[in-house]
Amino acid sequence: MKALEVDNAQNIRTAFFISDGTAITAETLGRAILSQFASVPFETRVLPYVDNLERAEDAVVQINTAYQRDGLLPLVFDTIVSPEIREKINSAHSCNLDMYEGLIGRVAEETGVEPDGHSGHAHDNVDSETYKERIDAVHFALDNDDGARTRHYHAADIILIGVSRSGKTPTSLYLALQFGIRAANYPLTEEDLNDNQLPKALREHKHKLFGLIIDTDRLVKIRQERRAGSRYSSYQQCQQEQRAIQGIYTSQGIPSLDVSEMSVEEIATRILQMTGLKRRIG
């Protein structure tokens, strides 16, 4: 289909993650695919619980509106089971990437069994204990974010450390949400780094520590978005902190990972691989 002639100088393309459930699967797989096209600017939207024709029609309106605005066919990643709802979504002006249809067809061909075709079966089979593990892990990550409540570190599976704005919080939450890992995180301050040793709160939990490293240029850019023109976001300060923290990682024997060019999904997966931590869910 020919693109509309609109003012979209940056060629931003909209990507939708749509599901009749939480949309976590559609979003996770979709973002993994989009990450392979780093040069393309995407605006993403998540539409969960599109489980009836009325909601599907609303999704179609949003997709068509994005097409009218961008002049480019939106990419639609969906995990919708119902053929009727899927057909309605497919009627939109979009490039539809159905994540179930092709896979279910292959499984049916291999097993010789036709799929039920009912939405929600995956959710019916979810173990309530798995749900509890996920929620407990998320609560733990939130309660133990940014050095809060260090008295609970005995219950942590892992404690992420690093300088301010190095990705500790999003990684902790992703580990909790996707894998049920109880992840705390602790920022090493300038005072900690000047002492060239671990803070007292971390010493007895040294075996749980994992360090994040971020490129100085990347760190400057992130901090400038928060406090432009400050000493905190200056190149000299960021470089000094990075050198100091890498020295601590080395002297204390703390495993670490350079996360400068990684997505949070990649960071979390690499951490599990490097530490041998076992996921509690998934």
UniProtKB/Swiss-Prot annotation:
It catalyses: [pyruvate, water dikinase] + ADP = [pyruvate, water dikinase]-phosphate + AMP + H(+); [pyruvate, water dikinase]-phosphate + phosphate + H(+) = [pyruvate, water dikinase] + diphosphate. ADP binds at G162, V163, S164, R165, S166, G167, K168, T169. Its EC number is 2.7.11.33, 2.7.4.28. Disulfide bonds: none annotated. The keyword Nucleotide-binding applies. One of its GO terms (molecular function) is phosphotransferase activity, phosphate group as acceptor. Keywords: Kinase, Nucleotide-binding, Serine/threonine-protein kinase, Transferase. Pfam families: Kinase-PPPase. NCBIfam families: PRK05339.1 (NF003742). PANTHER family: PYRUVATE, PHOSPHATE DIKINASE REGULATORY PROTEIN 1, CHLOROPLASTIC (PTHR31756:SF3). Bifunctional serine/threonine kinase and phosphorylase involved in the regulation of the phosphoenolpyruvate synthase (PEPS) by catalyzing its phosphorylation/dephosphorylation. Belongs to the pyruvate, phosphate/water dikinase regulatory protein family. PSRP subfamily. This is Putative phosphoenolpyruvate synthase regulatory protein. It comes from Psychrobacter arcticus (strain DSM 17307 / VKM B-2377 / 273-4). The lineage of its organism: Bacteria, Pseudomonadati, Pseudomonadota, Gammaproteobacteria, Moraxellales.
